[in-house]
């Protein structure tokens, strides 16, 4: 398929998750409706990951595509119908022992993902070392956390040009080259083993108590000198604390097998969240999730959340924007050359600010223009004018004067306050 055909085929899948309730806004949201080019709900402005959207098959397709053409093809399977790679995530079902009684159902726990190791006891131990609220037990807070992190850490528009908004053929080609590069140089999947099992991969590795966490040395000479076998001590590359030899450790092949992490320490160095399904990106001695690795390589548009492959883009408010996406967050009108106000780190045009966000003056009860000076006390505001910031009793102008606030009213003196009480 040529580039022109690829560009024409692109779309954002606006029916996906349509009407799903927002877990954050509850009844305030009418249901999920994807914005035309922003990756948010048009109704409540929250992301799709904040909505109760059933996306297990879609997420498996996304991760499957990520692993396509990599050394991790054993983690995917291609559907016979369309050849699309699907992620073969390891689901673990544990049966808890219960007293043998009649009419008692078996107590089972299903993990929506577990490390793909043959030793189920090791996988179970790995799970127990994660914070309880992050253990992906089906139907739990942890399962919701995993789903949210899959969407956040591995956005499909960071790997698939067809999920982006109106890329040019040149941008499509650049993105494909970028994806190929990070698959070859940075992408990896953690491996869970006991620390002692890794001695075969790193036979000359020792950790000296009180020394550097990844100190290496030739053991043979030391043992010949001392004549004693010294027990290896292991420390976590993340928290630097010691690790128990019988506890599972996470290894990252791209980092080298002289580094290991506690399960709960295998996190992105930027957002500090658990690396979902142990999928990591390695760069300059640090672990990253997919999103923050890409952020370290390319500018990201604060409007559409996509990486910017164009040579021309704008910077405003310490953020990057596609030229066509520097728009009002409320009405989508382009803001180039226009007055705007930042509301929750999002640009809003002046008319929308006055209509939807401006505070109301306690004096005249009109919205306060963003360019006009105002007086604010607690949650109350006034125009900083002789017509509005007045004593609620005698109408004396209080600009530059001491005043007594009482439930949205202001007084110039105790006498005036008593007269209004």
From Swiss-Prot:
Pfam assignment, any one: LIM
Keyword vocabulary terms for this entry: Cell junction, Cytoplasm, LIM domain, Metal-binding, Repeat, Zinc
A Gene Ontology molecular function term of the record: zinc ion binding
Residue ranges annotated for the PET domain, each copy included: 92-199
Gene Ontology cellular component terms for the protein in this record: cytoplasm; cytosol; focal adhesion; plasma membrane; protein-containing complex
LIM zinc-binding domain: residues covered: 234-297, 299-359, 362-421
SUPFAM superfamilies: Glucocorticoid receptor-like (DNA-binding domain)
Sequence ranges of Basic and acidic residues compositional bias: 154-165
Keyword check for Ion transport: no
Gene Ontology BP, a term: negative regulation of cell population proliferation
Domain of life: Eukaryota
Domain notes: The N-terminal and the C-terminal halves of the protein can associate with each other, thereby hindering interactions with ZYX.
Role of this protein: Scaffold protein that may play a role in cell adhesion, cell spreading and in the reorganization of the actin cytoskeleton. Plays a role in the regulation of cell proliferation. May act as a tumor suppressor.
Protein family per UniProt: Belongs to the prickle / espinas / testin family.
Subunit note: Interacts via LIM domain 1 with ZYX. Interacts (via LIM domain 3) with ENAH and VASP. Interacts with ALKBH4, talin, actin, alpha-actinin, GRIP1 and PXN. Interacts (via LIM domain 2) with ACTL7A (via N-terminus). Heterodimer with ACTL7A; the heterodimer interacts with ENAH to form a heterotrimer.
Protein name: Testin
Organism the protein comes from: Dasypus novemcinctus
């Amino acid at each position: 398929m040529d580039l022109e055909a690829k560009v024409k085929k692109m779309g954002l899948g606006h029916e996906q998750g349509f009407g799903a309730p927002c877990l954050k806004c509850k009844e305030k949201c009418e249901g999920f409706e994807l914005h035309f080019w922003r990756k948010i709900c048009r109704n409540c402005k929250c992301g799709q990951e904040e909505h109760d959207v059933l996306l297990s098959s879609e997420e498996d397709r996304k991760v499957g595509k990520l692993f396509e053409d990599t050394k991790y093809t054993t983690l995917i399977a291609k559907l016979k119908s369309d050849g699309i790679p699907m992620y073969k995530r390891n689901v673990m079902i544990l049966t808890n022992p219960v007293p043998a009684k009649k009419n008692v159902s078996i107590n089972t726990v299903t993990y929506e993902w577990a490390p793909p190791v043959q030793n189920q006891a090791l996988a179970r131990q790995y799970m127990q070392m994660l914070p309880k609220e992050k253990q992906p037990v089906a139907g739990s807070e942890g399962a919701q956390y995993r789903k949210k992190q899959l969407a956040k850490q591995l956005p499909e528009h960071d790997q698939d040009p067809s999920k982006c908004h109106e890329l040019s053929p040149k941008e499509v080609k650049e993105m494909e080259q970028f994806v190929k590069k990070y698959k070859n140089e940075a992408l990896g999947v953690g491996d869970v083993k006991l620390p002692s099992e890794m001695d075969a991969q790193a036979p000359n590795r020792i950790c000296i108590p009180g020394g550097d966490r990844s100190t290496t040395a030739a053991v043979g000479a030391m043992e010949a000198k001392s004549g004693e076998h010294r027990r290896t001590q292991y420390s976590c590359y993340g928290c630097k604390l010691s690790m128990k030899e019988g506890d599972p450790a996470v290894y990252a092949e791209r980092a080298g097998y002289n580094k290991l992490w506690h399960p709960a320490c295998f996190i992105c160095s930027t957002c500090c969240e658990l690396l979902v399904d142990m999928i990591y990106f390695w760069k300059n001695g640090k672990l990253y999730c997919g999103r923050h690795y890409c952020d370290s390589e390319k500018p990201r548009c604060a409007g559409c959340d996509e990486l910017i492959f164009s040579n021309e883009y704008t910077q405003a408010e310490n953020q990057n924007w596609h030229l066509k996406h520097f728009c009002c967050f409320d009405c989508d009108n382009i803001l180039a050359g226009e007055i705007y106000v930042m509301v929750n780190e999002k640009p809003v045009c002046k008319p929308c600010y006055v209509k939807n966000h401006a505070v109301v003056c306690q004096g005249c009860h009109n919205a306060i223009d963003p360019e006009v000076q105002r007086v604010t006390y607690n949650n109350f505001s006034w125009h900083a004018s002789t017509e509005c910031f007045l004593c609620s009793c005698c109408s004396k102008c209080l600009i530059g004067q001491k005043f007594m606030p009482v439930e949205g009213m202001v007084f110039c003196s105790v006498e005036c306050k008593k007269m209004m009480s």
